[in-house]
């Protein structure tokens, strides 16, 4: 057996080893219809049939509170060409103020839910709340995908074309990488 030296790593920072992670912008609306948008990297698909996605949010964030009251959200894929504008949506903007407007991002109506889709995003998953679980200091929010849309050319051979979309991946804090090449393994 081979011997290797490993350093201890703080358990409370374990999430910092699971990087980079896809970064999406989640759009919601409050009960008055005010638009909210925020970036999230604790995201994942959790079921193919039926299609279900999940992300984690601090329970006091506007996103989690809006979903709890309206039961709808949209996951918007973040391409590298809007990374600076995405970062604006991470700011602590007061409830009721539109983060998309503050970031200079455009939006359009969704097909099946009230929260809007971000025009600059190459893909969108419109979701209805399935369940929200308290997990430590976050809520795990699961949503049934009720509609999906992609920009023309954003999908190649049934997969997101990372070479053209250049999706944003979160390393930690304000550090990101861009997923812009594909490596095939055999």
Curated annotation (Swiss-Prot):
SUPFAM superfamilies: FMN-binding split barrel (SSF50475). InterPro entries: Flavin_Rdtase-like_dom, Split_barrel_FMN-bd. Its cofactor is FMN. Keywords: Flavoprotein, FMN. GO terms for molecular function: FMN binding. Pfam families: Flavin_Reduct. PANTHER family: FLAVIN REDUCTASE LIKE DOMAIN-CONTAINING PROTEIN (PTHR33798:SF5), FLAVOPROTEIN OXYGENASE (PTHR33798). Homodimer. Belongs to the flavoredoxin family. This is Protein MTH_152. It comes from Methanothermobacter thermautotrophicus (strain ATCC 29096 / DSM 1053 / JCM 10044 / NBRC 100330 / Delta H) (Methanobacterium thermoautotrophicum). The lineage of its organism: Archaea, Methanobacteriati, Methanobacteriota, Methanomada group, Methanobacteria.
């Amino acid at each position: 057996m081979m011997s290797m030296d490993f350093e201890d790593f703080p358990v409370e920072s374990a999430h910092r080893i699971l990087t980079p992670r896809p970064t999406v912008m989640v759009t919601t609306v409050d009960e008055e219809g005010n638009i909210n948008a925020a970036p999230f990297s604790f995201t994942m698909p959790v079921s193919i049939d039926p299609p279900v996605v999940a992300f984690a949010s601090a329970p006091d964030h506007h996103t989690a509170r809006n979903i709890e009251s309206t039961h709808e959200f949209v996951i918007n894929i973040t391409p590298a060409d809007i990374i600076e504008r995405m970062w604006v949506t991470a700011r602590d903007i007061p409830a009721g103020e539109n983060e998309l407007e503050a970031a200079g991002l455009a939006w359009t109506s969704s097909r099946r839910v009230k929260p809007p889709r971000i025009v600059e995003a190459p893909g969108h998953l419109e979701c209805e709340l399935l369940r929200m679980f308290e997990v430590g200091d976050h809520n795990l929010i699961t949503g049934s995908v009720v509609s999906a849309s992609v920009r023309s050319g954003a999908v190649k051979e049934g997969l997101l074309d990372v070479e053209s979309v250049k999706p944003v991946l979160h390393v930690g804090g304000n550090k990101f990488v861009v997923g812009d090449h594909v490596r095939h393994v055999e």
